[in-house]
Amino acid sequence: MARKKDSPQKAALRELMGNYLKENNVKVKDGTDVNSIMRDMMSIILEGALDQELDEELGYSKYDYRNKETDNSRNGHSQKTLHTSYGDMEIDIPRDRKGDFEPQVVKKYQNSITQDMEEKIISMYAKGMTTADIESHMRELYDIEISDSTVSRITDKILPIVKEWQERPLESVYAVVFMDAIHFHARNEGRIVKRAVYIAIRIEMEGRKDVLGMYVGQNESAKFWLSILNGLKNQGVEDILIACVDGLTGFPQAIEAVFPQTEIQQCIIHQIRNTTKFVSYKEIKPLMADLKRVYAAPTEEVALAELDSFDEKWSGKYPKIAKSWKDNWANLSTYFKYPEAVRRLIYTTNTIEGFNRQLRKVTKSKTVFPSDDSLLKMLYLAMIDITKKWTGHRQDWGQIHSQLEIFFEERLERL
């Protein structure tokens, strides 16, 4: 098959390179030699483009003083090391005397000519795009061919940042911490396994909401939560006023082992779902109406009376419902001791479930992750994107803060 005819630009470059190799007696033996030549070519092209940028900035070319219409001028060069796919190379960056010149070809704080592309790839990964989608996107928009391994290599740069974030120093006290787990599938030693991502969202005493931590483990267990809570304590957390959790067996005991004074609120919505999932369609509506009288009661005393009434009415058909509520009452009823504003904040884990739903949207194209690291990378990047919108605090936080200061006065004074 005949070689495709070169474009005029490529033909000129081919001739130039041929003359360069011949006149300098350059022998290309392996990839190392190719990289060396490419570095030289790239540095010449970049330096020429940078000089041209400064010409346009000043409005006159070098030595063309007759057309100079500015009090600014050239001021030599500074050297910069650029990391490229062909290895490190030194280039000369032109300077102006006033320091106004902001080069665009190689920006001031850019240390890699692929940095912008890497940022684009990381951003696409954060939006939940698969490696195949990213490859296609880069090919169509930028005419760049990249592989799965290249995407992984670029996004792997996030992992040290994630580790540093997981181990960062924390504040001594948090008003409320919501804790829950979300489940995914990942490959491990050639098998597809279920993974639990443990998530904690904090509300600071000033009312700001943020993600306290995310950790990948095996199926959700109180033992793993215990290790996370110990880690939080080692990072500086001395007290959590109220912890809002699901109904995982052993979870309250794990919290009490690390933060013995923490008030524990078990999620009412989780409890409703877990105890009514086997109720018949015909009876679910009246049963839920009776159950609402329990959790929506104005006081704990009224709630207990309504629970007894519910037990009498429904335990013939559904004996486990009232029993479960009574067995877990100590942690289900915590919110009754607080005023309405605090109750609304803590009686469900909707805060963290909303966050989990947003993570699901990002990861919906991934049925199985290649590894635990790839799962953590995507969730961390998605978290950064999601929490950008978390600004300010709740409108009623002033009222909530005042109430918490009264209820937890002694504990807060000790911190």
Feature locations, PLM:
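Subset of Sec-pathway N-terminal targeting signals
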Residues: 1-29, 33-76, 81-86
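Acidic/histidine-rich catalytic cores and adjacent linkers
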Residues: 3, 260, 293-415
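Electropositive nucleic-acid engagement tracts
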Residues: 61-70, 129-176
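Basic, short loop/linker segments at the boundary and entry of helix-turn-helix/winged-helix-like folds
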Residues: 69-127, 143-156
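RNase H-like nuclease fold core
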Residues: 94-97, 105-109, 144, 157-245, ...
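Metal-dependent DNA phosphodiester-chemistry modules and their immediately adjacent helices/loops
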Residues: 102, 275-303, 309
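Conserved beta-strand -> loop -> alpha-helix junction used to position metal-binding or nucleic-acid-contacting
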Residues: 242-249, 254-290
